[in-house]
Amino acid sequence: MAGARSVGSLPVPNVQALAEICNDPDEHIPERYIRPEASSEEVINNYQGDMAIPIIDLKKLLCPQSSEEECVKLRSACQYWGFFLLINHGVPDEVIANLKRDIVDFFSQPLDTKKEYTQLPNSLEGYGQSFVFSEDQKLDWADMLYLHVHPSDSRDLRFWPTSPASFRQSIDAYSSETKSLALCLFEFMAKAVGAKPESLLDLFEEQPRGLRMAYYPPCRQADKVMGLSPHSDAGGLTLLLEINNVQGLQIKKDGKWFSIDAPNGALIANIGDTLEILSNGKFRSVEHRAVINPNKERISAALFHYPSENMVISPLPEFVKDGKVKYRSISYLDFMKQIFTQQLDGKNRVEVLKLDQ
C-alpha cells in the first residue's frame, strides 16, 4: 500500500535459482530455509461436512430468492472460518486465463530479466521477497512480485513488467474486474450481520489495492521448508487466485492446519485483520501459510484490499450493538508500519489490540 513505501525488505538469494541447485541430491538446503515446524504440526487433508471450508455462490447472493440463505452462509464463513471459496464470481474466464498465462510466462523468464524489476531499498514493490528484516531470520521458499494496482496514480511502472508484452494489460484487466466483486462482498458482509450495506463499502470503495504474485519452487525436501510463514493478512479482504492448481495453502482452525484445495475457476477469499477490528470481532482474520510441493511449482496471485492510510481503525458503531468494544483504536498507517517492519508472526499484531473482556 502507499503508506508502506518508506519500509522495505532486505535482499535475499533468488529462491527459484537456489531450488535448481538444491534439488541435486548432493546439495543441502541452506540452514536459513530449514523450518522444523513445517513437518511437526498436524495437517487435515481430507475433510467434509462441518469441517469443510464454506463455499459461497455469488449468483445466489445476488438472487432475491436465495440471497437471504446465502447471506447466512456468508456470515458463518466470515465468523467461524475467516476463509471461503467463491464460485460464480463473475470475473470473465478470459481475464483470468490471460493473467494466469502471463504470470507463468513471467516467472519462466531468465533470472536476469526478472531482476530488472527488483525491489529497491525502502520499497515493497517489485520482484524479490517481503518481510525480511534480519540477517538471522528464517527465510521463505518463494519469490514474489508485488505491485500497487489501485489507484492508478499509485502505480510505479518501473516495477510493472513489459515482458510478457501483454502482462500490464492482463494485470489491469484483472484488477478492474475484481473491483466490483470485492465491493459486492463488502456490501453483503455488512448486510449479513444487520449493518447498513454501505458501512464497509464506503471504507474500501476507492482505496488502495495491491497484487502479490508468488512463485513457490518445488523442493525435494519439502517437509523441511516453508513457502510463506504463518500470518494473517493486514487489510480488509484478500482474493486469492491459484494459477496452476497446485495445492499449498493451509489455514489454521481450532489449533489444526487445514489444506485448501480450490475448485477450478473458484477464488479463495479471506478476512483481514482490519476487517476483524472494524467488525468488532464478528468477522475474524485467520492464520494461514503456504507449504511446498516436492515435485511441482506452485504459483498464486493475491489481491489485497486496504482502507485509507489516513484512517483510524476501530470497531464501527454498527458492529457494537451490545456496547462492548473489543479492540483498541490504532491509525492504519501505524498498524501497517508495524507489519511491514517485522517478520511474519501469526496473528500477533491484531491480538495485541484486543481489550480485556
Curated annotation (Swiss-Prot):
EC number: 1.14.11.-
Compartments where found: Cytoplasm
Molecular function terms, GO-annotated: dioxygenase activity; L-ascorbic acid binding; metal ion binding
Gene Ontology CC: one annotated term: cytoplasm
Cited Pfam families: 2OG-FeII_Oxy, DIOX_N
Keywords noted in UniProt: Cytoplasm, Dioxygenase, Iron, Metal-binding, Oxidoreductase, Vitamin C
Residue ranges occupied by any Fe2OG dioxygenase domain in the UniProt entry: 207-307
Tissue expression: Expressed in shoots.
Principal subcellular localisation of the protein: cytoplasm
Temperature dependence: Optimum temperature is 30 degrees Celsius.
Gene3D superfamilies named among the record's database cross-references: B-lactam Antibiotic, Isopenicillin N Synthase, Chain
Catalytic activity: melatonin + 2-oxoglutarate + O2 = 2-hydroxymelatonin + succinate + CO2
Residues involved in 2-oxoglutarate binding: 298
Residues engaged in binding Fe cation: 231, 233, 288
Top-tier EC class: oxidoreductase
Stated role: Involved in melatonin degradation. Catalyzes the hydroxylation of melatonin to produce 2-hydroxymelatonin.
Family from the record: Belongs to the iron/ascorbate-dependent oxidoreductase family.
Protein name: 2-oxoglutarate-dependent dioxygenase 11
Organism in which the protein naturally occurs: Oryza sativa subsp. japonica (Rice)
Gene: 2ODD11
